[in-house]
């Protein structure tokens, strides 16, 4: 069958492969079968366009006399090795020559006025000759793979007086550029009409975006010291771009335009309310304790802009200084309620601001088309299925008729949510609006968020003081009054735990209760079975302490559901899962419906009376729903044990909701007063929006605060004190190689790889591995950060295309029936940026024909690091996104993406069981210490592929230069993007801008 590739295409593919071997250090390899393996498993992914078969490529090289080929050996004739675009050293300029001596003062001079350096001075300017596009002050050079392009930058003196070129700085950290200057020495006088030429050669074997900057330093006309003399600079910003076909389809749809939020929603003096949803008829749970509103003080709202300015406590006005003093004082019992309440108020003010991102202008509503309810209107809300924004039954929003928004005092219509179906929300409005409504009438819509979680946290802070819980929150010593003998024999329900000494130790201390009133902590690193340990401990308490009653909680519905699923196996009649009425019953796992408060016959939630709920040995709720038990005023001594799973993932006031008012400190040997926290302080904590609350401690969970600051939980010479804390050490998830770096960085090398050998080594012989037996791939991509429309979140087309290529290899059908070799359910894709998540989903479900044709492709989860916490997959792919250097400092300031956020890095890389693939820019990531260790680990063990690995460079000097160059390079925002940082900081946290976290709906 004739090849579909021409001889020229076969030859070019072979030359590109030969260059690829040079970059990888494999140019001496001659074994034909080994070369075939490298070509098929590794080279084709980074080729960017469809590549010919290995044998066809060899044929093309052979007939072109570029290779010697036998049945067992292949020898490529020596070529001009373009992987590094090499030139004769006598002509080639050193990149950034003399920059180490001058770069600090040089970069400082042009920090604020980059645009000025694009224009000629004293008649001197730069002429460009060669293929390029000029865009926003940047010279864009489009490359075909393995094909050289040459650009000549001609510095011409078009003035009437002589000038002197004193220095020339080609600033570039990538080998795709080479600069040479025809042996013209510097300094070089340039008389009127004279030129100085710099030749720029560009070539790449890899798709990507490769930036460079050229800076000319000149001495102006006139004698030194005379009028007109002086140093001036001219700059040109270059970018070589080689796109894969898929990446070309992912370019920004519309230019990025930053939106401004105009303030609070328009709520006028005239408000008309719709009808609230009917309360469940089976709501028998008492409401004995009132719940306050706890609105932020108006004065705090007024002072917030000044607080965000970061004024020193010593120079700030008195009110600001007092608030800052409260924020900067360490958390103690004496300031516990005051400081945490202030932080909650600040977080709420940020939420009020962030929710405005979702407001809609001139959107139509229609009559409810499905239920034929004449009193409900339907509104399309993009993103509501992903809780962006969160809209639940019982919530409300405000709507103004578009035609009335400019009136002096229009009517604001308050609509209550009755039903949510995919991206459609069904709302009840007042009869006066319904009487004049016609399909297609347009509105301005302002969203709100549910304040219930904040209100119950404020109440919990009040109750903490009322019930004097300081011995539990700031423990100093145990009462040492055991409930059972320390040698009590535990017959485990899960017999597999008997071989794990750490899990046995934790369960024994929890059951005997020797730690009270101090909480007992199960420190569970990734994959060590903390939830399994906690569940078995609950079962043992039920078994050995007949009078015990347990409240088991988690911050999320999924976490609470998991507790219920595992407890019901052995305690089916003793447990009850209490769900919030806003929970979509379709999202509730089928196996827990028999033991939860859903009445299938009535088709609604029920809430049994307090007396009925007290009959169950174990109640399971989210932390926020536990507030309903406080409102019902359960007896303070009813719950003897409170277990909180995922305790490191919630704010401290959120943990208090399940404690304050439901548990008291026990002074005697009576059962009770035992709090158990399970989590990992090295993984992600609570998701916060306000930069102030992040800075001043609201991001600390109760678990992390105790581990960090309380002496009872400190690690001593002999390890942790098992009376208070157990660190689980056996990892049952990951291949030892995947576990290696996070184990060394975050867990003192103590974790032991105990995963099933067959499961963890499933991909050790996968053809796509750069090195067999090493199931980690770091695929280097020099991509480009992009943004589009009014979304501030970043995406990287080249990385998205590379991830898609790997998915095609992993999910390729293994038979003609179309059955995937690997189930999409076993694969997860992680990216820290919301827009990149959207682009990768678009590739999978729309652009790529092979992937979108898989029946179960919808089961492949693509999400943020936060969305994957607590989960695992056989294969994890990570797209780090950040590549253009112009936004590095934004990441450093706000802990965005992976840079400078060890917890996010730790969670991302520890989700994988058998194969971890990371796609990112090694040059950028190498400036973070943790990523640098990981990159070198991959390189040393043969797991690195993609663009050439950067040479080792001094970390601090490299970072200084990188950040300095970021101020020179044009960004996607245009030539004045250095103005972007202070503007975008104003009033909002970087996390909510870039990552766009889900709005909490765990009620």
UniProtKB/Swiss-Prot annotation:
Any one GO molecular function term: RNA binding
Pfam families assigned: AAA_11 (PF13086), AAA_12 (PF13087), MOV-10_beta-barrel (PF21634), Mov-10_helical (PF21635), MOV-10_Ig-like (PF21633), MOV-10_N (PF21632)
Residue ranges of the region described as Interaction with AGO2 and APOBEC3G: 921-965
Keyword Ubl conjugation: yes
Positions of region (Disordered): 966-1003
GO BP, one annotated term: positive regulation of mRNA catabolic process
Consequence the record notes for mutating residue 869 to A: About 70% more antiviral activity against encephalomyocarditis virus replication
Annotated Gene Ontology cellular component terms: cytoplasmic ribonucleoprotein granule; cytoplasmic stress granule; cytosol; extracellular space; nucleus; P granule; P-body
Motif (DEAG box): 645-648
Highest taxon listed in the record's lineage: Eukaryota
PTM annotation: Ubiquitinated by the DCX(DCAF12) complex that specifically recognizes the glutamate-leucine (Glu-Leu) degron at the C-terminus, leading to its degradation.
Enzyme Commission number, as recorded: 3.6.4.13
Effect annotated for changing residue 129 to A: About 70% more antiviral activity against encephalomyocarditis virus replication
UniProt-reported outcome of changing residue 530 to A: Abolishes 5' to 3' directional unwinding activity. Abolishes inhibition of RNA chaperonne activity of LIRE1. No effect on interaction with UPF1
Biased composition range(s): Basic and acidic residues: 976-988
Subcellular location: Cytoplasm, P-body; Cytoplasm, Cytoplasmic ribonucleoprotein granule; Cytoplasm, Stress granule; Nucleus
Ligand binding (ATP): 524-531
Residue numbers of N6-acetyllysine PTMs: 148
Assigned protein family: Belongs to the DNA2/NAM7 helicase family. SDE3 subfamily.
Name recorded for this polypeptide: Helicase MOV-10
